[in-house]
């Protein structure tokens, strides 16, 4: 499975290519975690798609220290490696609004759903059940789920489909034992973040973000 490292200091456009490289998040966690409050405050953009959908990150209200950044980076490295073993998942290491390591897992909607459908197929349920195990291991991880579509059909129809798909993924992950409180945002973005450089099929996707909760940050700060 492919893993890529991309760091965003402002609202960023996240794309996935045919191949990528893996970098360790620990050093980056130290670099960003040790920055000034002003520098961290500048990291304001959303990291879902082109940044227009949502910003992810716990509302901690202060810069996160170096040691905590390293610890969280280590946790996210582990989660990224585990998620990368799941068939049909694209894994990217990204940065949340606190400047901390986070993980984006993209599931191609062609794998999860039939055309214009939000019903999960049997193959996708196997992949999501495996992914649920990754999420259940650490209830201090916050989760955001975003659905995307291609441009076929009306804005309204695509918004509805993308929303239903995002909630279908959330609900199945919960059925597999993921704590409901971990889900901080679940929404459809339709084709508002359509990437013209990708195919229509690649734009039909569901993205799941794993990032540090306020509890995880507090625990990391206390331990460091």
Outline where the language-model segments fall.
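Periplasmic peptidoglycan-binding/anchoring modules of Gram-negative envelope and division proteins
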Residues: 112-147, 208, 215-224
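Amphipathic, membrane-active segments
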Residues: 75-104
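Short, low-complexity, glycine-enriched hydrophobic/amphipathic alpha-helices that associate
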Residues: 20-82
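Extracytoplasmic
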Residues: 86, 98-102, 106-108, 138-140, ...
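Periplasmic OmpA-like peptidoglycan-binding domain that tethers envelope proteins to the cell wall
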Residues: 148-219, 224
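Bacterial N-terminal signal peptides that target proteins for export
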Residues: 1-9
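C-terminal motif of bacterial Sec signal peptides marking the signal peptidase cleavage site
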Residues: 14-18
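Solvent-exposed, polar/charged alpha-helical surfaces in well-ordered, non-transmembrane soluble domains
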Residues: 81, 85, 122, 126-133, ...
């Amino acid at each position: 499975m492919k893993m890529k490292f991309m760091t965003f200091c402002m609202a960023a456009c996240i794309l996935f290519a045919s191949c990528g490289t893996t970098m360790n998040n620990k050093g980056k966690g130290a670099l960003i975690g040790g920055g000034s409050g002003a520098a961290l405050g500048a990291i304001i953009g959303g990291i879902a798609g082109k940044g227009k959908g949502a910003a992810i990150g716990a509302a901690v209200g202060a810069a996160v220290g170096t040691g905590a950044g390293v610890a969280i980076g280590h946790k996210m490295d582990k989660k990224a490696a585990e998620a990368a073993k799941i068939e049909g998942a694209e894994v990217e290491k990204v940065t949340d609004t606190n400047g901390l390591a986070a993980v984006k897992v993209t599931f191609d909607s062609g794998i999860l759903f039939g055309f214009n459908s939000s019903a999960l197929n049997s193959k996708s349920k196997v992949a999501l059940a495996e992914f649920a195990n990754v999420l259940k291991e650490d209830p201090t991880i916050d989760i955001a789920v975003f659905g995307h579509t291609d441009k076929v059909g009306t804005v309204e129809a695509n918004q509805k489909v993308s929303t239903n798909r995002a909630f279908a993924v959330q609900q199945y992950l919960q059925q597999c034992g993921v704590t409901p409180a971990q889900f901080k945002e679940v929404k459809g973005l339709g084709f508002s973040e359509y990437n013209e450089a990708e195919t229509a099929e690649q734009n039909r996707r569901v993205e799941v973000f794993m990032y540090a909760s306020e509890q995880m940050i507090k625990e990391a700060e206390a331990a460091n």
